[in-house]
Swiss-Prot record:
Motif (DDXXXD motif): 78-83
Organism: Kitasatospora setae (strain ATCC 33774 / DSM 43861 / JCM 3304 / KCC A-0304 / NBRC 14216 / KM-6054)
Record-marked site positions (Plays a critical role in the stabilization of intermediate cation): F75
Organism classification: Bacteria, Bacillati, Actinomycetota, Actinomycetes, Kitasatosporales
Binding positions for substrate per the UniProt entry: R171
Binding site for Mg(2+) 1: D78, D83
Comment, domains: The Asp-Asp-Xaa-Xaa-Xaa-Asp (DDXXXD) motif is important for the catalytic activity, presumably through binding to Mg(2+).
Protein name: (+)-corvol ether B synthase/(+)-corvol ether A synthase ((2E,6E)-farnesyl diphosphate cyclizing)
Amino acid sequence: MIPRFDFPWPSACHPHARQAEQGALAFAERHGLVPTAAYRSRLERTRYGWLAARCYPDADDVLLQLCADYFIWFFIVDDLFVDRVDTLSERTIPNLTAMIDVLDHHRPGAEPVFGEHAWLDVCTRLRAYLSDEHFQRFAHGMRMWAATAGLQIANHLGADTVDVAPYETIRRHTSGTNPCLALADAAKHGPVTPAEYHSPPVQRLVLHANNVVCWSNDVQSLKMELNQPGQYWNMAAIYAHRGLSLQQAVDLVALRVRGEIASFQSLALTLEPHASRPLRGFVDGLRHWMRGYQDWVENDTLRYADAFIAEDADDTAVRT
């Protein structure tokens, strides 16, 4: 049984979720991110615009659409470059390095790969919206996503999986959660200062929020991931591989998620009374992300639905 997660703060959703959803689908079509009609149907039932609306409920309309477009791009390329394809192919390294090059050079390569122009579009708009330093917070998270994908691939190519501790290190970066959290202040009261953002207590809050999203996803996506061809080790699967039953593994991960929620809230309540208005907004934005992701899974998306495992888990036949 897949557990539910409760939070000591309320849900929220941007009032323009439907517009963000329509805009994200149009963005994907415009940039050639939709390989087939069946894939279009998958995107429609996944509802990435609603994820943006729940995670950034107070964003202005420009940032909301930007995040919705970024989400639909990210999930598509993450599935087709890493998760739902063969563990390693001749395209893996060129695809991932092209994404880093867009960040480093701010231009497409000589022979752009699938999704590269869409990624440049997202980055160009984010650069215009954010300060240079703020954009680099986001960019660092994306560089780490592409780089740690190599560690994730190496783990799946080995004779056995690594244990949970090194898996946690890989997971917090391959998830793509950190770049999303780096935008939490932009969606509230404006950017926190570099000193605030990089301070140990604030980075500890970011770590707790990241763990909540990643580890809860590991139980919610478990059935889908166990059927993926290239990437199938997650926290629950590793615990089960080490001797627990699958349900015991799920329950243990859920217990750890609840511990992270409690630790986040305890630290946040200590920090907030003395924080600046932007920092209070950032902390609240982290709350929106944790709760918003859970509400999206429970109410909106069919990304992890049992009914679509056979259809969605394996993208090795998708041509890009």
